[in-house]
Amino acid sequence: MKIFCKILPEQEIREKLKSIEHVDFSLFVESLPQTNEDLSELNVLVLIEPNGYFGHSDWAIKNKDLFSLIITWDQRVLNNCPNAVFLGFGHTWFKPEQYTKKHDKKFQISHLCGALLKTYGQSLRHEILARENEITSIPKKFFPTYGDRHNIEEARIGKEEVFGDSQYGIAIENFSHKGYFSEKILDCFL
């Protein structure tokens, strides 16, 4: 059993799959094989992010025969890979103890811009941040960023600070794709 994952701790996945560790398979979650040694008898690819970030969907279509199964929401992959199955994607980074606790909500609006500026949605978030002073009818908390987005625990705490005490939040996705949304939508419901 080989685990390659960029979004979850590989050790945590390995522990959950311990009962099938004897099976010769490789699991690639938002990660691609780098060498033939990464591949096994059974190979599963899970695509999460839109192709516009890393080009993984394009790569998967070209290399579909390497995989026993491709799990994705991406319609192009589903149309071009007979070994692909649909799994709608939407998630939150928050843990149950964060989204089940009572937050003291105030009449205000929160907005988290983020540091990246690669997509149309990201440019819209930057535009809203730049025009923050035009919003005068409601109290607001606007944040250019929230800390280290590569540290999931710090990101969870930062996003709770951004959205935890506001009745309203502005959520703009990076991309618009059928079958996909990211944590940005759910963050506002904290």
Question: What is each of the regions a protein language model found here?
Answer:
Residues M1-L190:
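Nucleotide-sugar donor-binding catalytic core of glycosyltransferases
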